[in-house]
């Protein structure tokens, strides 16, 4: 089993959540949003089941939560028999963006962030979100970078996030 954290700030920012979950498996960190770009999802958490031969057997975008009994039972069934035919395969792929200009803004933001220009990165990502307001991955990364205390100082502040959404942020 492998998990992937999408966090533009890297492993240092993702590590506390992996440790809190007491994960007994490897977690990799996607700092470039490559998974979203490849699979085309815009929100997390997600679940992708890949069998031992490397074949994608099932994808569930948005709403996966191992704490929910139905998701936990599904994971258990897959681990016990990963080649079962009843696991649906969702082959939808894309860039994660409907508008190619939004993708350009995202990539510009990533280049700025890698150069250490956080302000320019946030501006570019806000442009991308303005064009694609349903891209929750970028929106939440903006929030996490601009307001780390809401994400990295204990529990994630979901009430604050709801307030941001209500305010159109």
What do the PLM-derived regions correspond to, one by one?
Residues 19-24, 30-74:
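Thiol/disulfide oxidoreductase modules built on the thioredoxin-like
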Residues 144-169:
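Alpha-helical linker/edge segments of TPR/alpha-solenoid repeat scaffolds
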Residues 1-21, 31-35:
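Structural microenvironment flanking redox-active thiols in thiol-disulfide oxidoreductases
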Residues 106-107, 139-142, 157:
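Alpha-solenoid helical repeat scaffolds
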Residues 51-123, 136, 146, 151:
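Thiol-/selenol-based redox modules, centered on thioredoxin-like
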